[in-house]
């Protein structure tokens, strides 16, 4: 615990640990396979709050295992290149990769949002014209659609193309079916195995820190933030995503903006590491 105490005394822990927790929360809020698949699965099987907890914790467990493997591998490699002359260069290279990851996430989020806005505008124009030409038929079809596919309200929230495809497939396969707890756990475990830029960021941070205890603590904090979000999403889906969206209009906006905050946070971490690496090289 000595290295952890020193880093805390220097104030580094108060930057990295909250950042890891926030990064985990934001990662869970981002439009992505785990969150969308979980919500679609819970709604399709009409799952209970207990099942939502199970699904969220299972997804977090497998996702955390991947992060642990990546982070521990990074710390193992960092021990092999622990020379003081090499470490600043590793910090600078890590910072460049992190900043590149942040820019890619920001651009991908912006592009996805523009596509979603374009699609929403097209749908609005179509509905507007349809109301004028076939008012009676439109009202009838709309009511019937609402009663037959209540989970379809999810499509009104911002999702990328992969999310919509996965959610639609899950709803078709599991709609109204009874599933066992083992199937729920397996679904959660497999859904959490998808790697993410946040895990890569944790890997590079651990390489920069040269600290096993703090690195492990960061992974734990990231997992805690992710678990909070995934469990909350699962429980929210079990209670009703429709009600959450109806009662708080900011829910959709928050989910849409979360990747921006996440990319900015990753960028700040990369900038912090880059400054330290550059300072070490100049010395």
Swiss-Prot record:
BP GO annotations: cobalt ion transport; response to cobalt ion; response to nickel cation
Residue ranges annotated as Cytoplasmic topological domain: 27-51, 107-183, 240-260
Record-annotated membrane-spanning stretches: 6-26, 52-72, 86-106, 184-204, 219-239, 261-281
Annotated keywords: Cell inner membrane, Cell membrane, Cobalt, Cobalt transport, Ion transport, Membrane, Nickel, Nickel transport, Transmembrane, Transmembrane helix, Transport
Membrane topology listed for this record: Multi-pass membrane protein
Factors inducing expression: By nickel and cobalt. Transcriptionally repressed by RcnR.
Periplasmic topological segments: 1-5, 73-85, 205-218, 282-283
Subcellular location: Cell inner membrane
A GO cellular component annotation in the UniProt record: plasma membrane
A Pfam family per the record: NicO
A GO molecular-function descriptor: monoatomic cation efflux transmembrane transporter activity
Annotated stretches, region: Disordered: 120-149
Positions with biased composition (Basic and acidic residues): 120-148
NCBIfam families cross-referenced by the UniProt entry: PRK10019.1
Similarity comment: family membership: Belongs to the NiCoT transporter (TC 2.A.52) family. RcnA subfamily.
Role played: Efflux system for nickel and cobalt.
Name this protein carries in UniProt: Nickel/cobalt efflux system RcnA
Organism: Salmonella arizonae (strain ATCC BAA-731 / CDC346-86 / RSK2980)
Lineage: Bacteria, Pseudomonadati, Pseudomonadota, Gammaproteobacteria, Enterobacterales
